[in-house]
Amino acid sequence: MDMYQKRKIRAEKKNNNQEEKLTKVGINWYPGHMAKTKREISEKLDLIDVVFEVIDARIPYSSKNKDIDKMIKNKKRVLIMTKIDMCDIINTNKWIKYYEEKGIKVIPVDLINKKNISEIFKVTEEVNKELNDKRKEKGLKERKVRILILGIPNVGKSTLINTLVGKKATNVGNRPGITRHLEWIRINKDIELLDTPGILWPKLDDDTIAHNLAAMTAIKEEILDTEDIAIYIINTMLKLYKDSIVNRYNLTSYNDVVEVLDMIGKKIGAVRNNETDYEKVYSIILRDLREGYLGKVTFDRL
């Protein structure tokens, strides 16, 4: 990269000014199956006893689909916060308190180590008792509790279901859009769960939310440029978790994001003939954030 190119990048991607406004993205990513899913959910809502809304503890605001509030109407709802093992618990706890003050029950879970899963079953037992006590009063037979599981793509819905079932019931992968249709799954003799594809709102016109979703793989990487995502991650880490990123890549003095990228390139062996392989650097930054090598983080702040 010659000096002209570096100056151009510096002009476009200054990271010294943390208040710099992000490029307006106005992302339109609303595949046909998402609109279809919303219609099908509305059709089946009367069958549902409780809604499990799944969000990512690292982005507890950005990963919450605001359209779900309208979709589920007055149904009983539990907010299940996954990836609690990867978040900055001090700041995520503020979000837990925020949602609980709005009257929403929150259950933070670690799906890797299966922590707090019993709390989910405790809730379903309470719903089961309430449901079937009422049915008995009306002279009706007992029936299974029916749960609707909702959330944006790639927040851990499939992993959660497999954990509840105790075996592999759904496909799991670290990319959005794996589940493509509604499917009833039997959890045990008392619980049935309706799994749904991840659904976003029609237009992501909030820059910070869009970048948070892209950073944590809730939207496909093709939607936002990897350079843009990587630079957003660097700027956010330098602002919120400076020690973590400095220690990870042995960063010393730097004047702008290009110098940070060059230092990271040297650290990971992505420099050849004095030229940094920026695509490799971007890829490593995204990987390090998503796999926890940059430490425990929460990008949404109250």
Walk through the language-model features, giving the residues of each:
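Long, charged, alpha-helical interaction scaffolds
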Residues: 53, 115-116, 147, 161, ...
